[in-house]
Amino acid sequence: MYPAITPLQAGLQWWAVAGRQGVAELWQVQVETAADGADGEVEETLYWYLSELGLPHVERQILAGRLVLRGYLSGETPEGVMERWREHIRERLTQKAEIGWYAVERRDWQAAWREQWRPIFVGERLVIWPVWLPDPPGDRLVIPLDPGMAFGTGEHATTRLCLRALESVPDLGTFADVGCGSGVLTVAALKLGAGRGWAVDTDDLAVVSTRKNLEISGLEERVTVARGSTEQLSGPLDGVVSNILAEVIANLAPEFRRLVHPGGWGIFSGLLLTQAPRVVEALAGQGFALSETLSEGDWACLVGRFSADRPRSAGS
């Protein structure tokens, strides 16, 4: 029996997996564990193992007190690899988890998810508008988007939180988008008044998608797009937005401090509410002053500014 997934969910995964590898079959990988015992560390461990397996995106749900994480792989994944991967996770988790994989029914997911995807209205001023739909509204700033195979369609809470946060910054100026995905945050920042941007991502497909969406909006001359991370960027900038993983944000905190001038803004998401204190601590050690925590469901977005004070060294 095939698992129940929406055309939008499967369509995005088809683009990210089958579209990339030239296959038309998908396997759904599912990890399930007790929600009341799954603290931020356990959940982040599961995300890490799923990403190591090669899942480009992971869906998260709480169903009847159970934490359920799902992702999709091409149908060419050997069963033996999956068996070894399952045992590897079970040996390292501190609580019991059910791990399985299932064949997903073959169909034209690309057409199906286009039929299902609708405009996404965010905050007070923005709307993400699929490029294949006619007549965008005239009362909002339109972000025309063709997501391709990259993350960031507005379907995920962290993308929406970052967009709301960008709306709240009075003078965006120059900025960097670290982990740009589809480029939706880069386009939004420019539409909201930013002057010039730099967008980086370690995924080649994200770089291609960001460039394409900038061209759709006629903004390609105002953004430098590169494959990589903060090593591709130079400061000082007026601000930085980064919607990636909690651990990565914490590790990059010194780099964000290097890039943003004193008084500059920072918007950080891709983290759970339970992970926020740890990330705030890492950023605060680099002079970041938290002004607001936005939330949607279990997801958080940190908004604040970098102070003029240099971070303290150990023992000072």
From Swiss-Prot:
S-adenosyl-L-methionine binds at residues 159, 179, 201, 243. The gene is prmA. It comes from the Bacteria. This is Ribosomal protein L11 methyltransferase. It is an enzyme of class 2 (transferase). GO terms for biological process: methylation. Belongs to the methyltransferase superfamily. PrmA family. Its EC number is 2.1.1.-. It catalyses: L-lysyl-[protein] + 3 S-adenosyl-L-methionine = N(6),N(6),N(6)-trimethyl-L-lysyl-[protein] + 3 S-adenosyl-L-homocysteine + 3 H(+). It comes from Gloeobacter violaceus (strain ATCC 29082 / PCC 7421). It is found in: Cytoplasm.
